């Protein structure tokens, strides 16, 4: 984490408030789970990842969507599974199959909502719950992230609604990929800021490279973060991935 924070500082990017660790916010997550449990919106799930992938899913459901195997188990069936020694996860009992959100780049997006995990079998709050509670606690009103998470937005916005949290607005942007159209990795060369600096680029050049990739600067133009904030326009952001010139 310190490396990422240092990279932001080098690029001249700042943030509001202190850096908050999720490991310090466990009471908030458990409070949210209690809210849902009190409304009978949770249930224990004993399925393994392999069992979920092998189970038949509903028509049009995305790969890996939970098929509801443990949703309607009787108390006797739950007791039998508990006796086997397997620690259950806790899932949301979703009341809908889909939910619609507005995205700055994609417009109205309707996506499937399944019974997401709220608490893992090892007792750790799950990602979908944590990010929703974090956004609510910090009054986040806009989320900008990679478009690989677009399908997560409907279920997260639905969960926020159940917890009386105002869902944020969304902007899902294309990813930076390698020449083969895959996620960047160490084998692709200088993919971190430290790598770029070691290769001879300045922080100003790196900032310009990033800004020009989303239409906010001309190649070679020297820009600052405040200038980019003033220029930002979601309509300028390309709708296709940026092929990163790592090597």
Describe the residue ranges of each PLM region.
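Alpha-helix initiation and N-capping motif
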Residues: 1, 26, 49, 63, ...
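Residue-level "edge-of-site" marker
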Residues: 21, 48-50, 173, 209, ...
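Alpha-helix boundary recognition
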Residues: 37-38, 136, 197, 211
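Active-site cores that bind ATP or allylic diphosphates and position pyrophosphate for catalysis
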Residues: 50-186, 192-197, 245-246
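Non-catalytic terminal extensions that flank enzyme cores
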Residues: 80, 97, 182-247
């Amino acid at each position: 984490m310190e490396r990422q924070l240092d990279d932001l500082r080098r690029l001249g990017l700042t943030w509001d408030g202190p850096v908050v660790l999720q490991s310090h916010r466990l009471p908030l997550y458990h409070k949210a789970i209690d809210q849902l449990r009190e409304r009978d919106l949770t249930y224990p799930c004993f399925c393994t990842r392999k069992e979920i992938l092998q189970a038949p899913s509903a028509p049009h459901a995305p790969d890996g969507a939970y098929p509801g195997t443990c949703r309607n188990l009787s108390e006797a069936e739950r007791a039998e599974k508990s006796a086997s020694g397997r620690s259950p996860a806790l899932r949301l009992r979703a009341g809908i199959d889909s939910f619609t959100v507005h995205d700055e780049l994609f417009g109205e997006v309707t996506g499937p909502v399944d019974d997401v995990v709220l608490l893992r079998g090892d007792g750790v709050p799950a990602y979908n719950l944590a990010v929703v509670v974090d956004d609510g606690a910090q009054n986040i009103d806009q989320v900008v992230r990679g478009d690989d998470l677009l399908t997560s937005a409907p279920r997260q916005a639905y969960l926020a609604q159940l917890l009386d949290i105002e869902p944020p607005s969304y902007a899902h942007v294309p990813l930076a990929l390698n020449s083969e159209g895959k996620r960047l990795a160490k084998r692709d060369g200088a993919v971190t800021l430290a790598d770029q600096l070691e290769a001879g680029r300045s922080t100003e050049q790196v900032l310009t490279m990033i800004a020009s990739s989303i239409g906010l600067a001309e190649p070679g133009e020297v820009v600052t973060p405040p200038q980019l904030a003033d220029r930002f326009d979601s309509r300028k952001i390309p709708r296709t991935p940026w092929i990163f010139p790592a090597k």
